[in-house]
Design a protein with these regions (language model features):
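Helix-start (N-cap) detector for alpha-helical repeat units in TPR-like alpha-solenoids
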Residues: 33-34, 67-69, 102-103, 136-140, ...
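Canonical tetratricopeptide repeat
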Residues: 38, 72-73, 107, 142-145, ...
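Register position in tetratricopeptide repeats
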Residues: 12, 45, 80, 114-115, ...
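Canonical positions in the second alpha-helix
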Residues: 25-26, 58-60, 93-94, 127-132, ...
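Residue-level recognition of tetratricopeptide repeat
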Residues: 8, 41, 76, 110, ...
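Short coil turns that delineate tetratricopeptide repeat
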Residues: 30-31, 64-65, 99, 133, ...
């Protein structure tokens, strides 16, 4: 008998539509509701969260007992819809049956962070490392989460730095920990050191836009303006909805005296944050100058 999960996930790596076709055809031919769980996963990957939830619910109604996979998919879909209470219930359902289930535990940590329960998030990371066997990647990822929580949310950069270093010691390919160290160094105005960390992170994962943004900011502070726009463009291409990048790019265009282009990007910033009086006034001033 074929391993449905294994085949589905192998296809999913290369082609979401083919993976969905495999699960859909499998359900039509066999009536096996397990296929619906994987259909739900395919919907989740594409961002069709309501469809993912409906597919999981139907699978359970038809007798599928693959609760771990199903509730993890449903929980993630609910999380992406901002339904945190319902999402938490799904992941807690998984951990009640399998306390060591790593994915569900990491999503519960993510929920704590989103709901500003930062100490709870850190405690969950520590408890998991103390109570369950972790491979090096899991250990590194949990240390990385602790680092970012201390750095961004709890304003304790020194403990954050320690966590990032421990994360890298466990797994030298944890790009996000190098990014964290880059932010740490940049906050202390050690821009050359920060750039080194951001570049190391890019070597590991070239698709994390925060590293290009960090390099752009550091070069701006070092007055290396020749490369600032290049790195902001790269950052924006990867993080299209990050308003920090758009605003910084607008100011770079303004520095280059490309006022018309700058105005358009400032307006984009304003669409995301209409209460930004400073940007609103700046646009008005630039438009007046442009009329002269």
């Amino acid at each position: 008998m074929e391993n449905i999960e294994e085949i589905f996930n192998e296809i999913l790596v290369y082609d979401v539509q083919e993976a969905l076709k495999y699960s859909s055809d499998g359900f039509k031919k066999s009536g096996n509701p397990e296929y619906l769980i994987y259909t739900a996963h395919g919907y989740l990957v594409q961002g069709f969260y309501e469809d993912a939830i409906a597919a999981v619910d139907l699978a359970f109604e038809l007798g599928c007992d693959y609760f771990e996979y199903g509730y993890n998919v449903k929980g993630e879909a609910l999380l992406n819809l901002g339904l945190y209470v319902e999402s938490r219930r799904c992941f807690e359902r998984v951990t009640k049956e399998e306390p060591e289930q790593y994915l569900a535990n990491t999503f519960l940590i993510e929920l704590d962070i989103r709901e500003s329960l930062y100490e709870d998030a850190i405690n969950k990371c520590v408890d998991y490392m103390e109570n369950f066997e972790c491979d090096n990647k899991q250990l590194s990822d949990l240390k990385c989460i602790i680092g970012w929580t201390y750095l961004v949310n709890l304003n304790n950069p020194e403990i954050a730095k320690e966590a990032f270093i421990e994360s890298i010691e466990a797994n030298e390919n944890c790009g996000r920990s190098y990014t964290g160290l880059g932010v740490y160094e940049a906050n202390y105005k050690r821009f050359e050191e920060a750039i080194e960390y951001f570049n190391k992170a890019i070597e590991i994962n070239e698709d994390d836009g925060e590293n290009y943004f960090g390099i752009a900011i550091c070069n701006k502070e070092l007055n290396n303006f020749d490369v600032v726009e290049e790195y902001l463009v790269k950052a924006n291409a990867l993080e299209l909805e990050d308003n920090r990048i758009i605003e910084e790019y607008a100011f770079e265009l303004l520095r280059q005296e490309r006022n018309k282009d700058a105005i358009e990007y400032f307006k984009e910033v304003l669409r995301e944050n209409p209460n930004n009086i400073e940007i609103k006034n700046l646009i008005l001033e630039l438009e007046k100058i442009d009329e002269i």
